[in-house]
């Protein structure tokens, strides 16, 4: 009974936030603009603060380098497959974005924080930084020559100057350079971490509410949506097994790193994919795939929580 209560304490708030998002859309409690405001707060303030805090205070060891080295070829292979073979069967312009990046920013980091605490968020943040090496060129390619859309250089500049990227790199720089120790000696570190920690508190609830609000599954293209979702899940499940096997060969890798890799592979494809489409069909496909994979990843997270709790 105690184990059930422990798991329920993690899982019930997740589905409560999602259910409230669905209900809010049906009852018109909030508008799409309101939800975009929630997401903007998360991506520009809350999440960068959480990642900065985690990267600043983390004891980053060899396991972080191992995670980066193993995650990079995973998303690279996904992107190459989507460009070379995937679009032959599924002729959607934005298909590669679903396979070159997992939604570790909006969903992965908040879920990982729920389970292991904000101080461990850097483990997922490291993976988010790693995939950006592949995702940024893909975004540039998909967004090029689209009329009113930004040029590739503008998109790359926007990603590289995003609050999440800046705060991640700033936290890592202060940590690895030794500036963190100076801040601690001056008594500043505690003030900084308490402030950023306070600002990051609402991010999990806001993002899960947004997931429920934006859930959609169009009827016209359900066959392709389910096929692509199944393909994505199967591919990253195989990647997860391969990476876990490789981690057993590396000494000193702890359980939290393994869980971060596992959760990362079980996440949906990037929520940015719908916005990179060139047609209504592209948008519908990407939105549907993201919706299905979000439900699947949350179900897996519940199982994961029952094991870890």
Task: Give residue spans per PLM region.
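Alpha-helical transmembrane segments of multi-pass small-molecule/ion transporters
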Residues: 1-309
């Amino acid at each position: 009974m105690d184990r059930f209560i422990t798991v329920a304490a993690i899982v019930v708030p997740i589905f409560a936030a999602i259910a409230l998002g669905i209900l809010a859309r049906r009852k018109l409690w909030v508008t799409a603009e309101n939800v975009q405001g929630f997401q903007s707060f998360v991506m520009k303030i809350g999440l960068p603060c959480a990642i900065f805090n985690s990267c600043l205070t983390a004891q980053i060891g060899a396991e972080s380098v191992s995670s980066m080295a193993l995650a990079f070829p995973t998303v690279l292979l996904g992107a190459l497959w989507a460009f070379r073979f995937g679009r032959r069967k599924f002729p959607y312009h934005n298909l590669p974005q679903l396979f070159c990046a997992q939604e570790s920013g909006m969903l992965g980091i908040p879920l990982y924080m729920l389970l292991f605490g904000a101080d461990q968020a850097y483990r997922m943040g490291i993976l988010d930084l790693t995939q950006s090496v592949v995702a940024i060129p893909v975004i540039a390619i998909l967004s090029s020559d689209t009329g009113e859309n930004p040029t590739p250089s503008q998109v790359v500049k926007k990603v590289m100057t995003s609050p999440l990227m800046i705060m991640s790199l700033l936290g890592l720089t202060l940590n690895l350079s030794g500036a963190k120790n100076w801040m601690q000696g001056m008594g500043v570190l505690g003030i900084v971490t308490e402030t950023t920690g306070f600002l990051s508190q609402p991010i999990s609830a806001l993002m899960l509410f947004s997931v429920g609000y934006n859930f959609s599954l169009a009827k016209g293209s359900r066959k392709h949506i389910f096929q692509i979702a199944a393909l994505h899940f199967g591919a990253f499940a195989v990647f997860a097994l391969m990476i876990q096997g490789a981690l057993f060969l590396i000494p000193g890798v702890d359980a939290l790193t393994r869980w971060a890799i596992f959760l990362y592979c079980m996440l949906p494809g990037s929520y940015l994919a719908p916005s990179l489409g060139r047609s209504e069909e592209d948008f519908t496909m990407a939105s549907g795939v993201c919706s299905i994979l979000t439900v699947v990843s949350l179900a897996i997270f519940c199982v994961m929580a029952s094991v870890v709790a």
